[in-house]
Structure formats: structure tokens, C-alpha cells
């Protein structure tokens, strides 16, 4: 089932401010929280959906990627939480922080940078032969001024509230919960002199230009993984990956079916009746098809090995050419007269002999009406 639009999930406009997003998330989370809806699977699903939407839209970089590429930008992982999406421990920590005034943002510590999704559109020829493309993606890169530490002088201190854990335990009635430490923001460390460039984050926004080699034979839906080309990890953790999803544009001649190609070949009535040799286009140039006499529309001709070389097995698909007998148009008086003379020869048994399908069809129509009127 396709995902709902994140703005629709939170009930806000695409121009919503950060404050409007936060208020909408709070309302959504309070309404669907599992503790308020015990045993309600639909409410739990809505709660997760709300959490996922807010994680993306509350992050400026992720929001820009979502506005540009939609859900495809995050199919291999969201935020710093890894490719599996948010788990219930993180969700409970975040929501209770919001409900009880502890602030947003879960207590988790990211183990790596976020993965990035990018959609690359290719022509069929590029997908079949392979291509190298330069792309530009918005991302978070390690701050060069502080080498990713977030500290102007490189010094950090262990938080004296959470003692480096990044989380604190709170008791609310019968509930014991963990949430991000308010003193260090969940990092477990205090930066006395934040870097002036990244403001203590250790990462800065930048547009990265990359060269992507697309192998021959890719098709719509195939993904190319560029390891380590995702967002820089916080506090020196490894970067995420970049996933390039391929989308192949429709072609004017060929339709692709896996490694096979299909096309239509129009021929004249005279060619269909008398037979002929016609030239057809293939990905490797032209080829010839011998049309036997009395060929009908719909007949398939198979050209082995003229399809697409598989990106996985390296075997080659086939090209299937479907003949379409074209009715002549814009006839000259002489051509019309010749056709009228030709049609006049189709009388009695001669018509049945030369057009068996037409005769069989008319017999069927006559039999149908006889049965209907008897």
C-alpha cells in the first residue's frame, strides 16, 4: 500500500512553519498514542505514521529532499535512525517527551549518518548501454572547521546530568520513561565553545556533486548503492549511503518487458498479401524480417538476442516485432479504381476462399440472428 503524503498525515499545508509542524505533531501524537488507545491497531499505525512524517518534515534537509523526490528519497532509511525506520522505543521516548514537556527529539544516539535517496531518469538507450551521470544532491557534510566535533577548540566535556549516556530516566506516576537529556540534547557531551560555522552540530548543509556509473541493462525500480555517500554521521560516526533509483522513460518505438523488447511494424496490404522483406530498428542497428505471403495483423516475429543484455545474468533478451497491416489512405483516383476492381472479384465462394475469417464471422452473425428470431 502506498504511503500517504506527510503533510496530509499531519494535516498541515506544504508551507507550514516549524512551529505549526510541532503543534500538529503534538495533536496527532496525543490522539493516537497507544496508551490512550490500548489494543487499537489502527491507532498504533496512525501514531507511527505521524511520527515518521514529523521526523522528516521537522528536519530542514530531509524536508527539502522530500519536497523534491517524495517518499523515494527515504526508502532505504530515515534520519539518523538507520534503514529500518523508527522503532517503538524511540517513538515512546519522543512522544512522552512531548506529552510531559520534555521537548521533542528521541533519546537515541545515531550510529551512522542518514541514507539519501535520489531518482535518476534515463532514456531507454542509456539504460540499455549504461551511462555515467553527474548528479547534485543536498546533504549534510562534516564541518571542515571543527572536523565534525562541533567544538571550536576541539574540546568536549562529559555531561554531568546524564553522565555521557544522553538519556535521563523520569517517573510519571506508574510510568517510568527515558527521554533525551535536556542538558546536552541527547549527545552525552557538552561543548563549551561551539563551532561558529556549524553552531556545535558538527555538520553543515551542502550540495554535493557526484559521478554515478549506471551499469548496462538497468530497468525502472533498480537501485544503485553508493556506500558512504549519504549524510555525514554525527559526532564522527560513519556516513550513510546514497541510493540512486532508476526510472526509464517511455520510448517512441520499443516497449520493454524485462530483458525483452516489443515493437509494432506497419506493413502495406500488398506486402501482407504477397510477402516482402522489411527493415526494422533494433538497439544495435537495423535488421531484416521476411514477411511471408498472406501474413495477418498480429503475427509476431522473434529476433533472438536483439533485446536487452541482463544486468544480472548478462544473457540477452529478444525483440518481438508485431505486424500491423495498414489500411492505405489518401488514394489517387487510379489506386481507388484498382481497389474497386480487386474488390469486385470477391463474390460468392471466391470471397469465402480469399477471406476465410470474414466469411466465418458473417456466418456466425447470421446464425446468431437466426437463433434470436426463431
Swiss-Prot record:
Entry protein name: Chaperone protein DnaJ
Comment text on domains: The J domain is necessary and sufficient to stimulate DnaK ATPase activity. Zinc center 1 plays an important role in the autonomous, DnaK-independent chaperone activity of DnaJ. Zinc center 2 is essential for interaction with DnaK and for DnaJ activity.
CXXCXGXG motif repeat feature ranges: 143-150, 159-166, 181-188, 195-202
Compartmental location: Cytoplasm
Family, similarity comment: Belongs to the DnaJ family.
Zn-finger region bounds: CR-type: 130-207
InterPro entries (UniProt xref): DnaJ, DnaJ_C, DnaJ_domain, HSP40/DnaJ_pept-bd, HSP_DnaJ_Cys-rich_dom, HSP_DnaJ_Cys-rich_dom_sf, J_dom_sf
Annotated Gene Ontology cellular component terms: cytoplasm
Entry's cofactor comment: Binds 2 Zn(2+) ions per monomer.
Alphabetized GO MF terms: ATP binding; heat shock protein binding; unfolded protein binding; zinc ion binding
Principal location: cytoplasm
UniProt keyword Zinc present: yes
Residues that hold Zn(2+) 1 according to the record: 143, 146, 195, 198
Matches recorded under SMART domains: DnaJ (SM00271)
Binding site residues for Zn(2+) 2: 159, 162, 181, 184
Source lineage: Bacteria, Pseudomonadati, Pseudomonadota, Gammaproteobacteria, Lysobacterales
Gene: dnaJ
Cross-referenced Pfam families: DnaJ, DnaJ_C, DnaJ_CXXCXGXG
Biological processes annotated in GO: chaperone cofactor-dependent protein refolding; DNA replication; protein refolding; response to heat
Oligomer and partners: Homodimer.
Domain (J): residue spans on this chain: 5-70
Function of the protein: Participates actively in the response to hyperosmotic and heat shock by preventing the aggregation of stress-denatured proteins and by disaggregating proteins, also in an autonomous, DnaK-independent fashion. Unfolded proteins bind initially to DnaJ; upon interaction with the DnaJ-bound protein, DnaK hydrolyzes its bound ATP, resulting in the formation of a stable complex. GrpE releases ADP from DnaK; ATP binding to DnaK triggers the release of the substrate protein, thus completing the reaction cycle.
Organism per entry: Stenotrophomonas maltophilia (strain K279a)
Cofactor: Zn(2+)
Keywords linked to the UniProt accession: Chaperone, Cytoplasm, DNA replication, Metal-binding, Repeat, Stress response, Zinc, Zinc-finger
Amino acid at each position: 500500500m502506498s504511503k500517504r503524503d506527510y503533510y496530509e498525515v499531519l494535516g498541515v499545508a506544504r508551507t507550514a512553519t516549524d512551529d505549526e509542524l510541532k503543534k500538529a505533531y503534538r495533536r496527532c501524537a496525543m490522539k493516537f498514542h497507544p496508551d490512550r488507545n490500548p489494543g487499537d491497531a489502527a491507532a498504533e499505525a496512525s501514531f507511527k505514521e505521524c511520527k515518521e512524517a514529523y521526523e522528516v518534515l521537522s528536519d530542514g534537509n530531509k524536508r527539502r529532499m522530500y519536497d523534491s523526490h517524495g517518499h523515494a528519497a527515504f526508502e532505504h532509511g530515515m534520519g539518523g535512525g538507520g534503514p529500518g525506520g523508527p522503532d517503538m522505543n524511540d517513538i515512546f521516548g519522543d512522544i512522552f517527551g512531548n506529552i510531559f514537556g520534555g521537548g521533542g527529539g528521541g533519546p537515541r544516539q545515531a550510529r551512522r549518518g542518514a541514507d539519501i535517496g535520489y531518482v535518476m531518469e534515463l532514456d531507454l538507450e542509456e539504460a540499455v548501454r549504461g551511462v555515467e551521470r553527474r548528479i547534485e544532491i543536498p546533504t549534510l557534510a562534516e564541518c571542515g572547521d571543527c572536523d565534525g566535533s562541533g567544538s571550536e577548540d576541539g574540546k568536549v566535556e562529559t555531561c554531568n546530568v546524564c553522565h555521557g549516556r544522553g538519556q535521563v530516566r523520569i517517573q510519571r506516576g506508574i510510568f517510568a520513561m527515558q527521554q533525551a537529556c535536556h542538558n546536552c540534547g541527547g549527545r552525552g557531551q557538552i561543548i563549551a565553545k561551539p563551532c561558529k560555522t556549524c553552531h556545535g552540530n558538527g555538520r553543515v548543509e551542502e550540495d554535493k556533486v557526484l559521478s554515478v556509473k549506471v551499469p548496462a541493462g538497468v530497468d525502472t525500480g533498480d537501485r544503485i548503492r553508493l556506500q558512504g555517500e549519504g549524510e555525514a554521521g554525527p559526532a564522527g560516526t560513519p556516513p550513510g549511503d546514497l541510493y540512486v533509483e532508476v526510472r526509464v522513460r517511455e520510448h517512441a518505438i520499443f516497449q520493454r518487458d524485462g530483458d525483452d523488447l516489443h515493437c509494432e511494424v506497419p506493413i502495406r496490404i500488398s506486402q501482407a498479401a504477397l510477402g516482402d522483406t522489411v527493415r526494422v530498428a533494433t538497439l544495435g542497428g537495423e535488421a531484416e524480417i521476411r514477411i511471408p505471403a498472406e501474413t495477418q495483423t498480429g503475427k509476431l516475429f522473434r529476433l533472438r538476442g536483439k533485446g536487452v543484455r541482463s544486468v544480472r545474468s548478462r544473457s540477452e533478451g529478444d525483440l518481438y516485432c508485431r505486424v500491423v497491416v495498414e489500411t492505405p489512405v489518401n488514394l489517387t483516383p487510379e489506386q481507388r479504381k484498382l481497389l474497386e476492381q480487386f474488390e469486385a472479384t470477391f463474390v460468392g465462394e471466391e470471397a469465402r476462399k480469399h477471406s476465410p475469417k470474414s466469411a466465418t464471422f458473417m456466418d456466425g452473425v447470421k446464425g446468431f440472428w437466426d437463433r434470436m428470431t426463431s
